[in-house]
Amino acid sequence: MATTTLIEKLFPNIVGQTAAKGKMRFYIEGHSASNMIPHMMLVAPKGCGKTTMAEAFGRNLVQKGEAKQKPWLSINCSSIKNLEQFFDQIVMPHLMDKDITFMMDECHMIPNDVQNALLTVLNPNPSHTNTFSFGEFDWNVDFKRISFIFATTESQKMASPLMDRCERIDLEEYSNEELTEIVKLN
């Protein structure tokens, strides 16, 4: 009789990526205790499963005091044109005053004004909260309610201070054996 490890339960059907899955398991366990995760930056070449890994991670974040998955929002950053659009079309309707895990895929495409705003939003402090003002609105960010995950193939295009505010998780390129296993699963 085969036993299933905790990592296999948390990341079913994800082949390889042992180190990344181990780190993410640690953060899932920490989230269970504190309702917070560090801001994460998944970095890997195309086709290494950044989005799939982030989605699997997100499915394992449970709202504290409830037995349901924390809501998830994923956007492709190529759709973000400027800070005003980001605030009006993403922050206001989807993130403000919400319990949510927010994944920004292809984050190297985030415009500079949005990256600069994220520097303020993600600035670490003991209260685990920040306020970002834009126009007439104040966005009060509580990291016990909102979790940020970024994914990129081109980390060198990200502002260094923004990278410094994130826990970097590098995914490995798949071996031929792992690619064969992935094909068999699909």
Predicted regions and their residues:
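Conserved AAA+ ATPase core "coupling" helix
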Residues: 87, 157-186
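Short glycine-/polar-rich loops that comprise or flank the Walker A/P-loop
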Residues: 7-9, 37-38, 67-72, 98-100, ...
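Walker A/P-loop
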Residues: 29-75, 91-93
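Conserved AAA+/SF3 P-loop NTPase catalytic/coupling segment centered on the Walker-B
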Residues: 82-86, 96-125, 155-164
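Short glycine-rich substrate-engagement loop in P-loop NTPases that contacts/grips substrate
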Residues: 21-22, 68-99
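Conserved nucleotide-binding/hydrolysis micro-motifs of P-loop NTPases
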Residues: 46-48, 78-82, 108-111, 148, ...
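Pre-Walker A (pre-P-loop) alpha-helix and adjacent loop at the N terminus of AAA/AAA+ ATPase modules
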Residues: 3-43
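Conserved catalytic/switch belt of AAA+ P-loop NTPases
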Residues: 29, 92, 112-145
